[in-house]
Amino acid sequence: MSDGVQERAPRAGGLGVLFMHEVHNVRGRREDHFEAAFREGWMPMLADGDDARLLWYAHHAQGSGPAYTVVTITAVQDGAAWERLALRVQQGDLQKWMRGLDELRHEVEAKLLIPLPWSPLQGVSFDEVPVDGREHELSLYMEDTMWPYQDKFEEYIVRCGDVYARSLERPSSMLTIQAAFQPALGSHLRREVTLMQRIQRPEQLLELLRTHIPPEHRAPGTWMHDALDLRDQWTSRLLRTSAWSPLY
């Protein structure tokens, strides 16, 4: 999990670290080449400077969604670092790499995110992010993305932290929230919340998939019930980190 990379306190006087979230639709026969491009290209090239670091590289778990889909999250130090990174991709040393990457995928959807006030991940200690491709156990994540009602966005963010996130602090919880995000201004849909949740107890996931949620867990006073006053649309991705993903 590389918990040492996390800094709880956001920077004063600015947004601090930005997070570039990308969903790649990879060409099936080039899947291994695509992964190698990130492991041997993007990750070490970013590590040559202080502006950005690759954090997560994860596949859609087999049978859980579109085939050959990869999710990556890259941390960018701040707005100025984002500008420098964009220029490297557009006309600098990353231009050739990006052109080669585009030949390995059909398309990519990207958005720039900032952490919610209560997100466990606020800043990132770049010096502590692994960049050498060291291998480790695979991990499963449930990435939930919600779209609160127009007049309930701010309230949803607060209550999601006060109620839902705190409910996962129990030792028996299936999930632990590693990061919670909303889109940066002007970069994507405004009313969106994304949670990166590590599946601590996979056996509970199987039980969740094969059983109906009991009525007592959907009764008034529960998050499943009360949160419907704030949103009723969301989607979940089941992700499996690569063996070398810096965070897992």
State what each model feature region is.
Residues M1-G14, D32-H33, A37-W56, Q62-A67, ...:
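An amphipathic, aromatic/His-enriched active-site/gating alpha helix that lines ligand/cofactor pockets
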Residues G14-H33, P117-E203, A243-Y248:
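Surface-exposed interaction/gating patches
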